[in-house]
A protein has these predicted regions:
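Active-site catalytic microenvironments in core metabolic enzymes, especially phosphate/sugar-handling
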Residues: 1-263
Length: 263
């Protein structure tokens, strides 16, 4: 089937764009679309990405600090949770001596110059490093801007696997399961034994997401929804959490709406 689709696309000069785990892990991606269909709010990533953040530190003349910060933020820096434009700024003094053939922004060639500068620190996703460095070089007034990039061990809470969120109001387990069945047009869904609790906090993962069951339980979710759960995954969690399997395709069927909105 896949091969036939590829051949037909090539014959008709159609471009194919394929997104898999990148869209699974992205903010606004597969899991966010599922959460939207269910009606969840206060969304958080179940398993944040590790080793995906870096810190940028640069030094800018006081008079140009605002322009550099704005350029860095526009390029993707400074996002922490529900906050943007985040940075730390410390005033200090930079020194340099411009050699022959240079065109210094301030100071004279051959003379040691002292300039009041601001140390700007901010964070960014590692995949945006190239774009951010280009933005920095484009706006920084110095010919040779000084900047440092550090790897961070912080989890990137804005991207990762799975989502956990809350319903506006609690539902019984049967009410919730019936609504999920209708929303995702599922002929038959599987679930473990009902826990007897009402459903308010919901964890989910599109596709084969059973690997996130421990995280869903730790999050305090009342139910975990995913596309595939293996037979043995159902055992050992009786009374802990309601687990329901709606089908791999069914869980991701609304992903096309994401691309519709972009295109």
């Amino acid at each position: 089937y896949v091969e036939r689709c590829m051949l037909k696309a090539i014959k008709n000069d159609i471009v194919i764009y394929s997104a898999h785990t990148n869209l699974d892990n992205a903010q606004g991606g597969v899991n966010y679309k599922i959460a939207e269909k269910i009606g969840l709010k206060n969304l958080k990533v179940l398993e944040p990405k590790e080793n995906s953040l870096i810190k940028l530190v640069t030094f800018v003349p006081n008079t140009k600090a605002d322009a550099v910060r704005e350029a860095l933020f526009a390029a993707g820096c400074g996002n922490i949770g529900n906050y943007d434009s985040c940075s730390y700024n410390l005033e200090g003094e930079g020194t340099f001596r411009a050699k022959e053939g240079t065109h210094p922004f301030c100071g004279a060639i051959g003379e040691l110059h002292r300039e009041g500068e601001v140390r700007i620190e901010t964070i960014l996703p590692a995949f945006k490093k190239s774009a951010v460095v280009r933005a920095l070089l484009a706006v920084h007034p110095y010919e040779e801007p000084a900047f440092d990039i550090y790897p961070l061990q912080n989890d990137w809470t804005q991207a990762g696997s799975g989502i956990v969120g809350e319903l506006d109001k609690s539902e019984t387990e049967l009410e919730f399961l019936k609504r999920i069945k209708k929303t995702f047009e599922v002929g038959c869904l599987r679930h473990n034994k009902l826990t007897g609790r009402e459903i308010r906090k919901v964890a989910l993962c599109g596709g084969a997401g059973a690997f996130l069951l421990p995280q869903a339980i730790r999050s305090g979710a009342d139910v975990f929804i995913t596309g595939e759960i293996k037979y043995h995954d159902y055992f050992g969690h009786e009374g802990e959490i309601l687990m329901t399997e709606i089908g791999h395709y069914e869980s991701e069927q609304y992903t096309k709406e994401i691309f519709y909105s972009i295109i």
